[in-house]
């Protein structure tokens, strides 16, 4: 056993199991056993941040650290981590390196937390006003270049027609308004003439009257009697033109009777 190896070099007479147990207990739990290691104490806020360095008195870094971790905050942290539970004695925390200091009385004050630093100027992509101005200029340019005019002669002096001609390259193209004004007699021609109105244009009545007989050279259809056998066809559409017999699509020849 491991514990028996630590015993002194002497003759051991094993009489019973109780003597072996007593020897093991004396070897492991005796007065000469080493003390267990104690953990390190929790470092205080002063030990972490209050570093003694040789710096000039007007060093801005030291002033910033002192303003952030004031003596009141350090003393309050030491008081919270102190093992003493007496509140009266914890108000005075003696230290060998800083002397005896008392936590000063704290009072509220109004602080301005606004940032007055000048940031970098915004870029062109982030300038919202510039984006709005560019969009308004683009809309204004489109509205000025594309407009529905109503010139006396359709297609001449019309800004909308010029816009389409520049974009398409066709010099004869017209806008929708000029096209409807130029060809309104085709778009809005009446379907039939009214009985009580006189036609304004020299044209025949619509629809025309049917009174003439057809000429003699017109080819007339001749009726043909269908035979019992189905005639040869070129496509399936010819088979669907008539007949009561079912459609036979098989390729074998039918026997002749």
Curated annotation (Swiss-Prot):
GO terms for biological process: regulation of DNA-templated transcription; symbiont-mediated perturbation of host cell cycle G1/S transition checkpoint; symbiont-mediated perturbation of host ubiquitin-like protein modification; symbiont-mediated suppression of host innate immune response; symbiont-mediated suppression of host JAK-STAT cascade via inhibition of STAT1 activity; symbiont-mediated suppression of host type I interferon-mediated signaling pathway. Residues 94-103 have a biased composition (Basic and acidic residues). It comes from the Viruses. The keyword Zinc applies. Keywords: Activator, Early protein, G1/S host cell cycle checkpoint dysregulation by virus, Host nucleus, Host-virus interaction, Inhibition of host innate immune response by virus, Inhibition of host interferon signaling pathway by virus, Inhibition of host STAT1 by virus, Interferon antiviral system evasion, Metal-binding, Modulation of host cell cycle by virus, Modulation of host E3 ubiquitin ligases by virus, Modulation of host ubiquitin pathway by virus, Oncogene, Transcription, Transcription regulation, Viral immunoevasion, Zinc, Zinc-finger. Residues 43-51 are annotated as: Interaction with RB1 in competition with E2F1. It is found in: Host nucleus. The keyword Thylakoid does not apply. GO terms for molecular function: zinc ion binding. Residues 79-144 are annotated as: Interaction with UBE2I. A motif (LXCXE motif, interaction with host RB1 and TMEM173/STING) lies at residues 113-117. A motif (PXLXP motif, interaction with host ZMYND11) lies at residues 104-108. Residues 75-91, 200-209 have a biased composition (Low complexity). GO terms for cellular component: host cell nucleus. A zinc finger (unnamed) spans 158-178. A motif (PXDLS motif, CTBP-binding) lies at residues 246-250. Residues 26-46, 75-103, 191-221 are annotated as: Disordered. A motif (Nuclear localization signal) lies at residues 252-257. Plays a role in viral genome replication by driving entry of quiescent cells into the cell cycle. Stimulation of progression from G1 to S phase allows the virus to efficiently use the cellular DNA replicating machinery to achieve viral genome replication. E1A protein has both transforming and trans-activating activities. Induces the disassembly of the E2F1 transcription factor from RB1 by direct competition for the same binding site on RB1, with subsequent transcriptional activation of E2F1-regulated S-phase genes and of the E2 region of the adenoviral genome. Belongs to the adenoviridae E1A protein family. Interacts with host UBE2I; this interaction interferes with polySUMOylation. Interacts with host RB1; this interaction induces the aberrant dissociation of RB1-E2F1 complex thereby disrupting the activity of RB1 and activating E2F1-regulated genes. Interacts with host ATF7; the interaction enhances ATF7-mediated viral transactivation activity which requires the zinc binding domains of both proteins. This is Early E1A protein. It comes from Human adenovirus E serotype 4 (HAdV-4). The lineage of its organism: Viruses, Varidnaviria, Bamfordvirae, Preplasmiviricota, Tectiliviricetes.
């Amino acid at each position: 056993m491991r514990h028996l190896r630590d015993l002194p070099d002497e003759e051991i007479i094993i009489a019973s199991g109780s003597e072996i147990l007593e020897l093991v207990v004396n070897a492991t739990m005796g007065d000469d056993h080493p003390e267990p290691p104690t953990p390190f104490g929790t470092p205080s806020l002063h030990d972490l941040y209050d570093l003694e360095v040789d710096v000039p008195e007007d060093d801005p870094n030291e002033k910033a650290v002192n303003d952030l971790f004031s003596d009141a905050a350090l003393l309050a942290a030491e008081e919270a981590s102190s093992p003493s539970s007496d509140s009266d004695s914890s108000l005075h925390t003696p230290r060998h390196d800083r002397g005896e200091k008392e936590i000063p009385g704290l009072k509220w004050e109004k602080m301005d937390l606004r940032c007055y630093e000048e940031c970098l100027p915004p870029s062109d992509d982030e300038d919202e006003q510039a984006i709005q101005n560019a969009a308004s200029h683009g809309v204004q340019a489109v509205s000025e270049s594309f407009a529905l005019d109503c010139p006396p002669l359709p297609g001449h002096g019309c800004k909308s027609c010029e816009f389409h001609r520049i974009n398409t390259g066709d010099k004869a193209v017209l806008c929708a308004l000029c096209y409807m004004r130029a060809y309104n007699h085709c778009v809005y021609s009446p379907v039939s003439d009214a009985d009580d109105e006189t036609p304004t244009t020299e044209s025949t009545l619509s629809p025309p009257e049917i009174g003439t007989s057809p000429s003699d050279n017109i080819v007339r259809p001749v009726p043909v009697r269908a035979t019992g056998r189905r005639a040869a066809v070129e496509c399936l559409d010819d088979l669907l033109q008539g007949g009561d017999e079912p459609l036979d699509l098989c390729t074998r020849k039918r026997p002749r009777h």
